[in-house]
Amino acid sequence: MASKPAVSVSISNLYPGCENVSVRSRSMMFEPSLTKGVLEVFSPVTTALSSVDDLATRAIEIQNSNINGVGDFSVWEFSGNTVYHCCYDYFVANDPTAIHLILFSLEEPYEMQLSQATYWLNTLKALTPPQHNIAFGGRLQNPLKVVLVGTHADVASLIRGPGGEFCYAKEKPLLKELRNRFGLDLQLSERLFVMDTGASNSKDIKLLRSHLLELRNTILSTCNPMSGLMERLVATLPSWRKLTGPNQLMSWQQFLCDVQEHINPLVSEDHLRGVAQQLHSMGEINLMQSETVQDVVLLDPRWLCSGVLARLLSMDTPKAIHHYRGRYRVEEIQALAPESDVEELLQVLDAMDICARDLTNPGMVDVPALIKTNGLHRSWTEEEEDHDVLVYGGVRLVPAEHLTPFPCGLFHKLQVNLCRWSHQHHTGDDAVDEPPDGDIRLWTNGVKVSQGGAEAMILLVNHGQGVEIQVRGHESERAKCYTLLDTMVTISESLLSSTLPGLLPARYYLSPQQLQEQHGPIMVYQPKDFLRAQTQGESSLSNTMGGYRESFSSILAFGCAEVYNHSRQGRDIHISQVSLLARRKLCRLLDPPDALGKDWCLLAMNLGLTQLVAKHSSNLSTTPTNESPATNTDPSPSTSPTAELLKDWSVRPDSTVGVLMGKLRELGRRDAADFLLKTSPVFRVQVEGVVGGGRAGLGGIRPHL
């Protein structure tokens, strides 16, 4: 049994009921709305599934509480066990009326403190969807509010200042580093709050409470006051929860009808949606939306978070053999939630990408978060006699901006999506407790699928910092190999954009020859390698690890001329293919006025868009240049001139990545050109020109909540 870290007395005094939460590294979120709010606590500490702690938080525990001197809150406490993280994206950052606290222990080395804070800040940033209308400087109109808290100051033997508060020597470099990385994406508080773990009435605690109260009051000042309808709904919800039955789920239309029938027959749907959003912010209900489960109202979040998810994903679940593969019988799911309608429950869990129903065997359900089988299939088998006639290729998806792991739980969701894809595209007569033979195999941090003579392995690599997709097949099936790789990459990138809409991924390519030789480490080619080679008129790249060159065709298309000849590469790809997040970053770089004129204005003239200069120049004198969200409170920021420039320029057929990159270098903006070089797409296929290629079979991908 794992030992339990010491609990901070001061943090326990901040709100009651948190005595079973480690404060080594975690994040809390206060969501004040009207008279209440939500406090969320979660930790990045990875706990082995075999480690059981009777006092540990299971899934998400919710309680109402009062923070002394601040106000009433609904406290959401998230388990640090990563098995539960596959559901956190629906609750962690789904409301703008929030204050997030990221806590880390000052006992840890500085590098660990920076790593832990970066992980959580990157998670919050990744969960924030981008705005389609990009504001000046790429600013967000309502960035999440974040407070950094260093704990165990007394244990770390920090000295006190003249006012009695702790002084941390590395506070300024830590805040500077984090602000440089996230200051334009999140509203970071101006200081690091350093906590004394043994003094609940210390000045440090009082400063933190005062800051929380200030933030809370600011948020409440922008919220609508509690209406009579809301007061009646808050009073009525407890009785509705009792009448709803075993599942605390209700369709939006039924919720609307009940409100009109029992509370106010004149209430409109639009007005009720606003009230429901406020109830959502208060933690009274939770609104869940999906194209498969339309507008579901979760009447009691505790039922799902503290009940169903805690039992389903618990490490105490019986350890039958098939459970090590993450597969359950529907009857076992029913036993974990005996009072629930299991079919209705599975629809919601399926829409949340927590489980996947096996269409070839409807009595079985895949729950990848519970897989305990280790990497038995992390490399290709070597039993094929025709090994030399196989072709290989691969892609690695990584976060483009910050070298940090993907948020925990992402790969479990990817496994769910791949299970769903496999179930929808294949049939089999396998045994009840076995996955379809040859179609899909799952293990911890890995998946293996096959289709049409090609097979793929999808792996979580580099300590969670990359998702790697390797594909191989017979050399006579090169187009099918490309199709399978394209399908797997598309599923992965679609999941990233829906689950982590604020995370910008980059696509790297793996050396096909080294994959065939099965020798590591594998050479990884980045977008900049292809674009630089194109600029020099080359169509191959140097593998410095292997001592040879590899052609674009072999790296990008398995050497298939049918695919490669109907594609565009790097510099020739149209600017409209550059992602919204990449455009937003360019706006941050080019919008602020430059002393030498090397900004959007001169770029517009170089691109022949002089009409935009007069249109937007009048806004420059009143628009902040490069302020962080913490200091810039303009409620209606002006439109980004760089975004308008790219929008107008993209209507031209000759507006390519290569042209823009050249203009940026002529302008002397190497920073913007290098960023474009780093994140631009490398390869685009005109699907209609490829027989059997392109994105075949993608019709089975399910939308996400």
Protein language model features and the residues they cover:
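Extended, non-catalytic interaction/assembly segments in eukaryotic proteins
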Residues: M1-D72, S79-Y90, I99-D594, C601-L602, ...
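A general alpha-helix detector
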Residues: Q254, D258, K585, D599, ...
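Alpha-helical structural elements of signaling/regulatory helical domains
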Residues: V267, A595-L596, R652-S655
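Charged, amphipathic alpha-helical linker/scaffold segments
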Residues: R583-D634
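Alpha-helical bundle protein-protein interaction modules that mediate dimerization/oligomerization
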Residues: N606, N619-H704
